A protein has these predicted regions:
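Short aromatic-glycine-(Arg/Gly/Cys) micro-motifs in beta-strand/loop hairpins
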Residues: 2-29, 87-112
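Cysteine-rich micro-motifs
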Residues: 193-207
């Protein structure tokens, strides 16, 4: 098992997919583009910003599925693709999981390409008539990438699997009394609101 980690930006997902720090900057749901950190570096970043969660690479990869980002597909390229075996993937029109296409699966809609049906040319026309979009299998596979559902990730379980205990985030000290003043008459603390009123204890006027 490797001792490498992804850093998840836990503030938001894209659809159901978790987002990770991208190699070279930014964020990505593509695990092949996600930056991998050594344990010490991952923990240090978490200490700087607790929404950057370290995840063991092996743990995440074991739960990965295959998604296809519609932003990297064009109909003209697909039509020009040499689809030798005639097999196609069947996508729901105008339905996405984040940016990923949603496919006709054996058990219903799925954004996991591994669960998508891929009929031959003889059956393709029937799906087209039902309003589905057809994409050549080879073309789609070349543009697919590994992603992971955020809901499948259990942070405590993941950290236990590699014996990592994260330090508790340092909380700034409370300064609840920093906006309080002392009464000129009796010396009691006054809130910012009370300073504009007569002291509730001695009646002295403290307004500036």
């Amino acid at each position: 098992m490797s001792d490498l980690f992804y850093l998840q930006d836990s503030r938001s997902n894209v659809g159901s997919r978790a987002m990770f720090w991208r190699e070279g900057g930014g964020y990505t749901s593509n695990l092949d583009e996600a930056e991998q950190f050594k344990r010490e570096s991952a923990v240090k970043q978490y200490e700087c910003r607790e929404t950057d969660l370290p995840w063991p690479v092996d743990y995440v990869r074991a739960r990965a599925e295959v998604g296809v980002d519609c932003q990297y597909l064009t109909r003209s390229e697909a039509e020009a693709y040499r689809n030798e075996d005639g097999r196609v993937y069947v996508a729901y029109a105008r339905e996405w999981d984040g940016n990923d296409l949603v496919w006709r699966g054996g058990k219903g809609p799925t954004a996991n390409l591994e669960d998508a049906i891929h009929p031959g040319a003889a059956d393709a026309a029937g799906y087209l008539a039902q309003g589905f979009e057809l994409w050549p299998c080879g073309y789609i596979v070349e543009r697919s990438r590994p992603v992971v559902l955020a809901a499948l990730l259990d942070h405590k379980q993941a950290l236990r699997s590699v014996g990592l205990k994260l330090p508790k985030p340092k909380r700034p000290r409370s300064h609840r009394h920093s906006d309080r003043l002392n009464c000129d008459g009796c010396g009691r603390f006054l809130s910012d609101r009370q300073r504009f009123e007569d002291c509730p204890n001695c009646g002295a006027r403290n307004a500036p």
